[in-house]
């Protein structure tokens, strides 16, 4: 038994730039031999994904549009995937969003539209995507999403995103229960804070990083490569007995007293 992902078709959703956790995951999966299917939303991200995919040493990636707030576009995306590869063996769901003004101050100030937007993109999108992909996961497989400690504990300024991540965490468990009989595993990685494009929207993010460097058992922050290698493990047969799990990759910060 090894970490090889050769012969596996894995969908990677959420790559924005070279600092994205999704890109760290994509590189680890590529190095393990997987064929990658990238999705993007919008022309700006299309260009970025094409440029990054072009840096990989195998030219076998597929790149498709997929707006996860649009069920018809999700269906179109996965119909195209089915036509091109037939079978999907994994999905890396690395998608989250909340309005910047919701990520500062008190959670109580969250408005209805902001609440629904954060949950639609950050939580429900996983269910919508899995629903579309399920008919193509005929050989079993693995689904991995990204969560954060702010879904378990109150983290300053994380606010509505923390509530959305708590919803995502519960979704992982229910999806794992639904899909286990088909040998499809569903897990999440709770990554430590990483300086990504989406992290820029969180107020006082630098203080969060400093706190981790001072208090986490490993005395350092997390890298996209560490998260990527953990994802590769969860996609591999080495993790075949794991489902419904939330695996923390945060230098141990989650065990520290607040």
UniProtKB/Swiss-Prot annotation:
Activity regulation remarks: Inhibited by triclosan and acrylamide.
Binding annotation for NAD(+): 14, 20-21, 67-68, 95, 165, 194-198
One GO term (biological process): fatty acid elongation
Residues the entry annotates as binding substrate: 98
Stored Pfam families: adh_short_C2
Induction: By cold shock.
UniProt GO MF annotations: enoyl-[acyl-carrier-protein] reductase (NADH) activity
Enzyme Commission code: 1.3.1.9
Annotated CDD domains: ENR_SDR
Broadest EC class assigned to this enzyme: oxidoreductase
Function: Catalyzes the reduction of a carbon-carbon double bond in an enoyl moiety that is covalently linked to an acyl carrier protein (ACP). Involved in the elongation cycle of fatty acid which are used in the lipid metabolism.
Name of the protein: Enoyl-[acyl-carrier-protein] reductase [NADH] FabI
Organism expressing this protein natively: Bacillus subtilis (strain 168)
Lineage: Bacteria, Bacillati, Bacillota, Bacilli, Bacillales
């Amino acid at each position: 038994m090894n970490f090889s992902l050769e012969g596996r078709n894995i969908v990677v959703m959420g790559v924005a730039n070279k600092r994205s956790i999704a890109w760290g995951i994509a590189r680890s999966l590529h190095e393990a031999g997987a064929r990658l299917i990238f999705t993007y939303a919008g022309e700006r991200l299309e260009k970025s994904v094409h440029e990054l995919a072009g840096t990989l040493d195998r030219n076998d990636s597929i790149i498709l549009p997929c707006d996860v707030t649009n069920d018809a576009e999700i269906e179109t995306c996965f119909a195209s995937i089915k036509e091109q590869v037939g079978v999907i063996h994994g999905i890396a769901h690395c998608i989250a969003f909340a309005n910047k003004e919701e990520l500062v101050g008190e959670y109580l100030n969250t408005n209805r539209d902001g609440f629904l937007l954060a949950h639609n993109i950050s939580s429900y999108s996983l269910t919508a995507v899995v629903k579309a992909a399920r008919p193509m996961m005929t050989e079993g497989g693995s689904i991995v999403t990204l969560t954060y400690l702010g879904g378990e504990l109150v983290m300053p300024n994380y606010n509505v995103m923390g509530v959305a991540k708590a919803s995502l965490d519960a979704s992982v468990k229910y999806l794992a229960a639904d899909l286990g009989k088909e040998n499809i595993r569903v897990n999440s990685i709770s990554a430590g804070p990483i300086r990504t494009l989406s992290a820029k929207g969180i107020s006082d993010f630098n203080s969060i990083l400093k706190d981790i460097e001072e208090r986490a058992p490993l005395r350092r922050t997390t890298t996209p490569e560490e998260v990527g290698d953990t994802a590769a493990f969860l996609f591999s047969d080495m993790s075949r007995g794991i489902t419904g799990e939330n695996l923390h990759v945060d230098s141990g910060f989650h065990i520290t007293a607040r």
